[in-house]
């Protein structure tokens, strides 16, 4: 869960007893400190109308994707942030657990300097460690669209930099 205003990701563990649900528990296991971000004041324009789109900021998008690599576990997460001037970008995280609890292994904000808003992402990692981020794009000159970008497993790890260029899926 994104904790807007405190630059934290709150981690919860849920243990469900399907036979006796009163034995089920929800436990807050950690708060992970992120790089500073703001999710306020995002205005997503679209051509031909003054009607703006909701940035859905302040919450993680979709569900966190989980992968077990035997020697460590990974969860991928993302949410929308204000990258300046009310423009939206996608903040993404690779969370890792090597056996001593979850930590932020790498994080980054995808927001090329082209005036476009990027928000409402969905992020995942494959069995090779490649990361793909799909997201919505819009501006006063670009109709709402879908694009992807990513990070190859060959990229310098832990830096939060995408080395797979943005590609349009639907314009």
List PLM regions with ranges.
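C-terminal PAP-associated
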Residues: 1-171
